[in-house]
Amino acid sequence: MGGIVYAYELGRQLGKRAIFTERVDNVMTLKRFSIKPGERCIIAEDVVTTGISSLETKRVIEEAGGVCLGIACVVDRTKADAPSPIPIVASAAKLDLPNYLPEECPICAEGKLPLVHLGSRKMKEQAKQTL
């Protein structure tokens, strides 16, 4: 959901409509909108780390008959050795931040905050567990 405001403004600046996918039973879905066959689409994301959510969105676009041109994001956190599976055509910032395994995480070692997996799919559940 973090990319919706960015997508809206990107669409406004480009003179194009902005739509979004959402999860239904943990499956990315185009619930409120439609894509015309051959319609060219750019995936707008706030942060791209692994590109998994973008891949799910690309699948939805292609199943609807659209063409995915790439990703525009605010922050590109992809790694050189694990680039996004979809080309990132524009980003405001490229950040090379470390990812840690739980046993290697310095913050975890200090007992301040437990390490959780990448992404935000289960963020609400994880936040409840740490409180």
Q: What does each model-identified segment do?
A:
Residues 4-42, 50-55:
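Short, glycine/charge-rich flexible loops or terminal/linker lids adjacent to PRPP-binding catalytic cores
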